[in-house]
């Protein structure tokens, strides 16, 4: 009695016969048109658009946006507020930091439609060349930048950090998270760790923040 393996073996004749059958079927009427139809991709779907109402730098703005649009792209491409920078576009550098209802976020990681009715503050809304925010003035005084690309995000984040400390929001650097945080050099550096400066102006940034916070420069926890 033949084994199962022997029963499953194909002869050369059977392989050739199978190939001929396949060729014949593909040559049948309508086969080529069916293949072409299957190979043609369906037309792209139009984007889903939504109306997004925001308050940006104190002004009400209404945008018709693809629901996939990030807050960063809404600000830069639709509202032309290019002070907010696109760095890594993956939430790892902090260049796109803006304030949403007073809280700092990475605008590249957030969809604009998630912020219906929110108040957005960008670097343009913090101050102007003729009326600088205290943090902007301190960055200039202490050379808290070199190329300047990360500076808008650094300043927005720095403003939010001092507000967090003032409100008593704890951080990982605190030995006792139940204690009220202090605006020390180490505390501020820890909170600013998500904002990268490839030029290495970190010490100057910390000095600028210390001045605005009203603490002795260089004081450590």
Language-model regions: role of each:
Residues 2-221:
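Signature of N-terminal electron-transfer/Fe-S-associated modules in redox systems
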């Amino acid at each position: 009695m033949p084994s199962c393996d022997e029963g499953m073996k194909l002869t050369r004749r059977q392989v050739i016969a199978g190939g001929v059958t396949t060729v014949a079927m593909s040559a049948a009427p309508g086969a080529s048109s069916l293949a072409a139809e299957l190979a043609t991709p369906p037309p792209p779907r139009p984007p889903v658009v939504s109306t997004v109402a925001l308050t940006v730098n104190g002004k009400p703005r209404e945008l018709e946006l693809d629901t996939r649009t990030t807050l960063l792209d809404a600000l830069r491409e639709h509202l032309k507020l290019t002070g907010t920078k696109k760095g890594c576009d993956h939430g790892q550098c902090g260049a796109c930091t803006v304030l949403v209802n007073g809280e700092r976020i990475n605008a590249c990681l957030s969809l604009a439609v998630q912020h219906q009715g929110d108040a957005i503050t960008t670097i343009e809304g913090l101050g102007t060349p003729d009326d600088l925010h205290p943090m902007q003035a301190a960055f200039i005084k202490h050379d808290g930048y070199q190329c300047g690309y990360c500076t808008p995000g650094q300043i927005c984040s720095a403003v939010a950090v001092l507000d967090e400390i003032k409100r008593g929001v704890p951080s990982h650097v605190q030995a006792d998270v139940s204690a009220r945080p202090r605006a020390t050099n180490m505390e501020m550096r820890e909170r600013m760790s998500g904002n990268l400066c490839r030029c290495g102006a970190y010490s100057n940034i910390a000095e600028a923040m210390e001045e605005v916070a009203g603490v002795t420069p260089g004081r450590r926890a």
